[in-house]
């Protein structure tokens, strides 16, 4: 798949997720097979660009090309300025968020709430495309609710405004993440456009990725929640699409080493105590399908230092590898 001058291969992409797709996670997913990793959204209001959170979100040093940064907001010129600012700070692709269903985002008329105002959508897209010399992409949902499934109209507006690629989550805003994603609307959008279209929503296995690509005709798939605690899913999907064969499940040693490396990257990126705190949700995701995961989380979430967090994690997985009960009572 081509987005401007950038070839995206393999055609499996890490979706932007607030509080998840930070630099350590993007680097990990790219290393494990993602063709593109989109940053968590950065707010367009310049009053917040100097905050600790924003500075972390705008740190792209050492990331492989292309660097894709998502921006969120409601005011066309403010979003245009945010796009320019992020390009000046390393962004090679600008992604506009019109897909986030979170109440606090939609109440501010950002995210998927923008889909209710098609004229405003056109003004925002035109302003951002004119503001920067890099490709601009867009992420949307299929509509606001089942009675207002205007994704195809928004998609046509996006293409007419110069958007370089479009990602579509197969739910409406009012569904949030309930029910199941539908891909018929995505197929309809793909059939009507000339720009690349990316399907998102409930793509949680190599077989599902292949099915969605086949059934919709889209150019790539985007994976979000299924990558939490499973960053190797990108390599699994890429291998299946290339060969038609499934990779064996990752070994416990591979999971342990991947998680320990992820923890170390979080500790280094955020410092103490923030790195330990942010790592806790990732620990829960990695451990959720393993024996005594609830007991492990109860113990490891009490760790206050990087050293303790790493030691508890290593001991837990070493015990699983050895086939003995994890020493959780001793660690507590």
Swiss-Prot record:
Keywords: Flavoprotein, FMN, NADP, Oxidoreductase, RNA-binding, tRNA processing, tRNA-binding. Transmembrane segments: none annotated. FMN binds at residues 16-18, 70, 139, 200-202, 224-225. The keyword RNA-binding applies. Its EC number is 1.3.1.-. It catalyses: a 5,6-dihydrouridine in tRNA + NAD(+) = a uridine in tRNA + NADH + H(+); a 5,6-dihydrouridine in tRNA + NADP(+) = a uridine in tRNA + NADPH + H(+). The keyword Flavoprotein applies. It comes from the Bacteria. PROSITE patterns: UPF0034. The active site is at residue 100. GO terms for molecular function: flavin adenine dinucleotide binding; FMN binding; tRNA binding; tRNA dihydrouridine synthase activity. InterPro entries: Aldolase_TIM, DUS-like_FMN-bd, DUS_fam, DusB, DusB-like, tRNA-dHydroUridine_Synthase_C, tRNA_hU_synthase_CS. Its cofactor is FMN. It is an enzyme of class 1 (oxidoreductase). Belongs to the Dus family. DusB subfamily. NCBIfam families: nifR3_yhdG. Catalyzes the synthesis of 5,6-dihydrouridine (D), a modified base found in the D-loop of most tRNAs, via the reduction of the C5-C6 double bond in target uridines. This is tRNA-dihydrouridine synthase B. It comes from Xanthomonas campestris pv. campestris (strain ATCC 33913 / DSM 3586 / NCPPB 528 / LMG 568 / P 25). The lineage of its organism: Bacteria, Pseudomonadati, Pseudomonadota, Gammaproteobacteria, Lysobacterales.
